[in-house]
Amino acid sequence: MQHPVSTPALFAKKCKYACLTLIALSFVFLAAGCAGSAKPAYNIERYLLSWPSPPGDEARRLPVCIKFNRFSIAAAYNSTDMIFRDDDYGFDSFNYSRWAVNPADMIADGIAADMRSVGKYQAVFSRQETAGGRFVISGGIEEFYLRTDKSGKTALISMSVSVEDSVEKGTARILFQKKYLQEERLQETSPRGYARAASRATQKIAH
């Protein structure tokens, strides 16, 4: 019996099929390797400043409107990172915990909410509202971080606040200007404990 002899065309076809099979298998193994080496996803916990509103006092309401400018913040703290420092040079943040909002906006919103709650003014407008007011409140956050040292862990806030009369001109516009430095010890050593301590510190400045 005569055995069939492979032609060059048939041989080339078999080689092509074998190459395609190897390429397909390579992609499968590569995909499996990438999937196996992928880093696991972590949930990011987000925190807000929060404190009890002061009691109302509408009996002494003043016929004036207050407008909040957007508070500024030092570049080092201008993010949602929950920053901690152990000296004048160190600078770090929690890996899986963040502020839900930029600290400058959280502080301004909290102070504005307190002023509305008191009911002492005809109206209090936030930075997002288009309405204006005669008296304009501006602020600047200079430091906002968790200090960690031998004495323990402390929430630290350093900021300045000013109030201007938009009707006046020159130096007469500035009615009030003050710098605040508030520190509050943590009662719980955790990002949540830091958020609570920072809230108490901000509350003392606001009130």
Give the ranges of each region predicted by the language model.
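Generic short beta-strand segments
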Residues: 71, 140-144, 181-183
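Feature marks short, surface-exposed loop/turn motifs that line or immediately flank catalytic pockets
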Residues: 75, 145, 163-165, 184-188
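A structural "domain/chain start" motif
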Residues: 33-104
